[in-house]
């Protein structure tokens, strides 16, 4: 089996400086930059609403709740991902079903996804 490695984060000096500015402001959450980000991402995605959350786990959990996953449901997730992906599904009572990923994209294989679909799949 071939190992698929995660990549090094790409963080610019501008990003680092802005994070420093935010930390010095005393508002790590719900400050002016949070509102600005929500406004910009809403505009960029042409969405009616945008909301920030404290972590990817929280965002995934909210997404699973919005998708109305329930006990007895199965949700296909990538086999190579952060544990939060499967945990967010579990928090709703649903069961995560793992599908392998392809090299080099790291995306789930369509063939593997199709083989995992059952009557319980959401």
PLM regions with names:
Residues 1-27, 32:
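N-terminal "arm"/small-domain region of PLP-dependent enzymes with the aminotransferase-like
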Residues 12, 57, 82-83:
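Alpha-helix N-cap/helix-start and coil->helix boundary motif
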Residues 13, 35, 107-110:
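Structural motif corresponding to alpha-helix initiation and N-cap regions
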Residues 27-74, 88-92, 98-100:
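Phosphate-binding glycine-rich loop
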